[in-house]
């Protein structure tokens, strides 16, 4: 086990081999598709919606549509008509199993399905993976989570998941560690390193990334993709509700396990924040790409692979 987080780690540069950072390639392959960057907006109702999913797919960025008040049939039909990748989320309730049945009967097989529950190391997830595989075979790429241990990663892979999502409660609007005493909040990067030792398939680092440099750190410690909420929230195009405070425009950002998303105050493990509106989403993507190109140049390579080999230090200022 490794008790450190993003702010505790600094990566060490290697000799630069490019003349310009623009030469560095940030693309990543997940399943059958290659995407421009190893980042994906969190599948939260205040971060992603159908319009943004279409925009991201058209620009060759990965996305995962959230599962709240969502018509999967019409969405997948629309994406297939547009010849874009379809990527949806499911839970593990009875209606989710029925939805998989319906999609199969209609021959609407999504390219990606993310099984998305707070504690993903569970029999219910095993049953859902098996159900999807029985109905859809290998036609869809299954991402399962969320988990926090190497044993969980091994089990999900053994059950048939193509990738695992690592991170229990490290997100900015997640209060799992406060409500339950459990989770990876405060040591999320260590959890990625720990879990990656057991993984034979891709890991998606989910939560706890606060600045662009955390993407490179996630890759260094074993992540293939990074799921990010707060950095992608509160853009002009974001689905969060607009709120004006003292003539300043904010957007709501809340956790999937918050009472605001659930519509009831039961088993709450999320909260709501207001974030100042930060401009166009594609401007943030562009800045992330440039920063990640810089990371690759500091790593001494031309692709993301170079970051995986760099040395690092654990800072003396670390709380651990």
Curated annotation (Swiss-Prot):
| Full protein name | GMP reductase
PANTHER family xref list = GMP REDUCTASE (PTHR43170:SF5)
- This entry's Enzyme Commission designation comes to 1.7.1.7
Biological function: Catalyzes the irreversible NADPH-dependent deamination of GMP to IMP. It functions in the conversion of nucleobase, nucleoside and nucleotide derivatives of G to A nucleotides, and in maintaining the intracellular balance of A and G nucleotides.
Q: Which GO terms describe its biological process?
A: purine nucleotide metabolic process
Query: What is the scientific name of the source organism?
Result: Mesoplasma florum (strain ATCC 33453 / NBRC 100688 / NCTC 11704 / L1) (Acholeplasma florum)
The cross-references to Pfam families, in alphabetical order and at most eight, read: IMPDH
Q: Cite the entry's keywords alphabetically.
A: NADP, Oxidoreductase
Checking InterPro entries in the record gives: Aldolase_TIM, GMP_reductase, GuaC_type_2, IMP_DH/GMP_Rdtase_CS, IMP_DH_GMPRt
The positions annotated for binding NADP(+) are: 203-226
Any GO CC annotation of this UniProt entry: GMP reductase complex
Q: Which family does it belong to?
A: Belongs to the IMPDH/GMPR family. GuaC type 2 subfamily.
